[in-house]
């Protein structure tokens, strides 16, 4: 259950109540049910968008990928294995990613369903870069702002009949807690329709904050990053 600016539940008390209700309903139905409360105040991983996130997921299956995505993937796998009565240790789960077994199983799943695991993912023909306006520490990269920007680039729909661009989205080159320099690339915007860039940049206004190194805001951003993406476990 996600909580934060980019989630349906903005406050942790709301998310906790929803998670507790879902766990209780599942348990009452005789199904082993657990929930994780996860931080969505800033985007998970380094991408937002359809093909971009698939590519990032494949990096994780191949033993790489962003640490926060790996941590959440492993945590969910441990919970699901335990709920199924086949518990595993964390180091076993991480080893399955690191040694390629997870990727091998994914490739086999795709092949058995008639797909091609070697099929290339599409790339956006148009990109633009968003740069840091000043030196300092990136203290805010708001998940809602990034999500709206990705949507305006074509990654989502305003109406159910609207087409979705598989290639559209945002790549993040820095996360809250990182030191940045003026002019450094913070984001890459991806789309098939370059006229979308202006409104995507407008969506990001106010969603990116750079604070002075050594400030309380910078220290808080580093502390939040070190805390990790998993806030609570319920059930």
Where are these regions (language model features)?
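Well-ordered secondary-structure scaffolds
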Residues: 1-235
């Amino acid at each position: 259950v996600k909580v934060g600016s980019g989630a349906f539940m903005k406050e942790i008390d709301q998310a906790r109540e929803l998670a507790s209700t879902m766990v209780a309903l599942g348990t009452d139905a005789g199904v082993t049910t657990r929930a994780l409360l996860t931080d969505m105040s800033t985007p998970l991983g380094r991408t937002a968008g359809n093909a971009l996130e698939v590519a990032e997921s494949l990096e994780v299956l191949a033993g790489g990928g962003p640490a926060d995505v790996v941590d959440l993937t492993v945590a969910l796998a441990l919970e699901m294995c335990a709920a199924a009565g086949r518990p595993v240790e964390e180091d076993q789960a991480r080893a399955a990613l690191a040694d390629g077994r997870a990727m091998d199983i994914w490739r086999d799943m795709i092949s058995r369903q008639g797909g091609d695991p070697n099929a290339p993912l599409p790339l956006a023909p148009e990109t633009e870069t968003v740069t840091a306006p000043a030196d300092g520490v990136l203290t805010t990269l708001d998940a809602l702002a990034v999500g709206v920007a990705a949507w305006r680039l074509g990654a989502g729909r305003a109406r159910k009949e609207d087409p979705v661009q598989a290639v559209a989205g945002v790549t993040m080159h820095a996360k809250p807690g990182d030191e940045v320099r003026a002019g450094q690339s913070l984001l890459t915007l991806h789309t098939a329709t370059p006229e979308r860039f202006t409104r995507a940049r407008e969506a990001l206004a106010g969603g990116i904050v750079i604070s002075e190194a050594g400030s309380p805001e910078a220290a808080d951003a580093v502390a939040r990053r070190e805390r990790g993406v998993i806030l609570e476990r319920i059930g």
